[in-house]
């Protein structure tokens, strides 16, 4: 009998594969919508092990406290503005309809009040490129243009932590801890590189699958690897 696959072992929910959720400070999102323009103070900058971007703990003048991805250059004690009448300066939170064209923004809401969904990674940002009626056209980090409602909020500037990939990992032990804290299974060994006892694609005198890579949706867990319930594989015929 063969050994269990990686996804079968992970499915048991043992500490080896479980996310260390207790070490994360909390969700990073905007507070509930408010039509007023309020000021907030950055009281703490936090390293979240599950993210590459540092978090800023902000306390508004009405006492509401929330976490947000820190903008580049943000510091403890900084006063930021939150609302439609805020100035378009780095760290301030405004509706997209109030942000001038050509401005770099991040942590953009897809729908007003959802807390922020787009351009949240360290060093990534979206660019306000135009208007289309009740929507603002954004150029996303992928290069695609997307229309977002004018009432959706965004933070002015660029998320802190840019340039993180410039530092080499150097050794496998660093990579182990990097992915362990982010709830990612690592290392990811190819099935064809395994022995026959470890994977349906393993074994043989050279690395090859040795069987069709497509598998039925109803296949048992030990066989369910490869292209699951695929309509086609490879390039589409012209």
UniProtKB/Swiss-Prot annotation:
InterPro entries: NA-bd_OB-fold, Rib_uL2_dom2, Ribosomal_uL2, Ribosomal_uL2_arc_euk, Ribosomal_uL2_C, Ribosomal_uL2_CS, Ribosomal_uL2_dom3, Ribosomal_uL2_RNA-bd_dom
Record GO cellular component, one term: cytosolic large ribosomal subunit
Keyword Ribonucleoprotein: yes
GO biological process: cytoplasmic translation
Function text: One of the primary rRNA binding proteins. Required for association of the 30S and 50S subunits to form the 70S ribosome, for tRNA binding and peptide bond formation. It has been suggested to have peptidyltransferase activity; this is somewhat controversial. Makes several contacts with the 16S rRNA in the 70S ribosome.
Assembly notes: Part of the 50S ribosomal subunit. Forms a bridge to the 30S subunit in the 70S ribosome.
UniProt record similarity statement: Belongs to the universal ribosomal protein uL2 family.
UniProt protein name: Large ribosomal subunit protein uL2
Species this chain originates from: Aeropyrum pernix (strain ATCC 700893 / DSM 11879 / JCM 9820 / NBRC 100138 / K1)
Gene transcribed to yield this protein: rpl2
